[in-house]
C-alpha cells in the first residue's frame, strides 16, 4: 500500500512539473513564434545548396512572418530583438539583394541567426505570459503580413504573387475582423470596401497597378491605425 501511495505521489508530482511546460508550449505566443522558424531553416538550406534565388525567397518568407510576431521579442528582450532585426536580418537582406551575393560568406550569419532565434523561443517558453492583448496585436500583424506583400509584388510586376498574397489576407481577415470592428466601425467599413475594390481590380486580366497600389495603401492606413491602438492598449498606455 505504501509503495502504491508513493507511486501515485510521484505521478502527481510529475504532472505538476510537466503542466506549466505544456501550458507554455500551447500558448499562442509560443506556437506563433515557432511557426516562423522553418523559414530560417529554409534560408540556411538554400545557402548550403548555393541557391541564391531560393535563399532570397525563403528569407523573404521569414521577413513577412517575422513582422507578425516580432512584437513579442521586442517586448521581452530589446537586446535580442535588435540582434535579430537590426543586425543579422538587416545584413542578410542587404547582402542577398546584391546581384551576385557571396553565399558561403552568408551561411555562418544565417546559422547564427537561426541559433539566436532558437534562444528567443526558449526565452519565450520560460517567460511568464504577457498581457493577452499582445496576442491580439500579433494576430493583427500576422494577418497584415500578407497585405504588406501585395504592393512590393506589384512593383516588381509579379501579379501572380500580388493576387496570392491578397487572397491569403482576404482569407485570414475573418479571423480578426471583429477585433477591428470593435475598435473602430468606420475603419472596419473602409477596410471592407477597400478589400472588395482590390479584389475586383486584381481580377482584371491586366490590373491597373497604380490603382491597386493606391487601394492597398488606403486599406493599410486604416488597418495600421487599429494595430497602433491595440498595441497601446497592450502596453497599458
Question: Which role does the model predict for each range below?
Answer:
Residues 18-24:
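Sec/Tat signal peptide C-region and signal peptidase I cleavage site
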Residues 1-9:
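Bacterial N-terminal signal peptides that target proteins for export
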Residues 24-237:
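Mature extracytoplasmic or organellar-lumen-exposed domains after removal of signal/transit peptides
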Residues 9-16:
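Bacterial N-terminal signal peptides
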Amino acid at each position: 500500500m505504501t509503495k502504491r501511495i508513493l507511486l501515485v505521489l510521484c505521478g502527481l508530482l510529475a504532472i505538476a512539473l510537466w503542466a506549466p511546460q505544456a501550458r507554455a508550449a500551447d500558448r499562442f505566443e509560443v506556437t506563433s513564434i515557432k511557426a516562423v522558424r522553418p523559414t530560417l531553416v529554409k534560408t540556411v538550406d538554400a545557402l548550403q545548396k548555393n541557391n541564391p534565388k531560393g535563399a532570397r525567397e525563403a528569407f523573404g518568407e521569414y521577413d513577412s512572418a517575422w513582422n507578425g510576431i516580432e512584437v513579442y521579442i521586442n517586448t521581452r528582450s530589446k537586446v535580442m530583438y535588435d540582434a535579430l532585426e537590426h543586425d543579422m536580418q538587416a545584413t542578410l537582406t542587404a547582402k542577398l539583394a546584391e546581384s551576385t551575393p557571396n553565399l558561403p560568406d552568408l551561411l555562418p550569419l544565417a546559422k547564427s541567426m537561426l541559433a539566436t532565434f532558437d534562444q528567443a523561443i526558449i526565452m519565450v517558453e520560460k517567460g511568464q505570459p504577457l498581457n493577452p492583448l499582445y496576442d491580439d496585436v500579433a494576430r493583427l500583424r500576422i494577418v497584415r503580413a500578407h497585405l504588406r506583400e501585395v504592393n512590393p509584388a506589384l512593383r516588381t510586376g509579379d501579379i501572380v504573387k500580388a493576387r496570392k498574397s491578397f487572397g491569403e489576407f482576404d482569407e485570414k481577415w475573418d479571423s480578426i475582423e471583429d477585433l477591428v470592428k470593435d475598435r473602430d466601425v468606420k475603419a472596419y467599413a473602409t477596410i471592407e470596401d477597400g478589400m472588395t475594390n482590390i479584389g475586383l481590380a486584381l481580377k482584371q486580366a491586366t490590373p491597373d497597378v497604380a490603382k491597386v497600389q493606391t487601394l492597398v495603401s488606403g486599406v493599410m492606413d486604416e488597418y495600421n491605425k487599429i494595430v497602433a491602438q491595440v498595441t497601446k492598449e497592450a502596453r497599458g498606455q
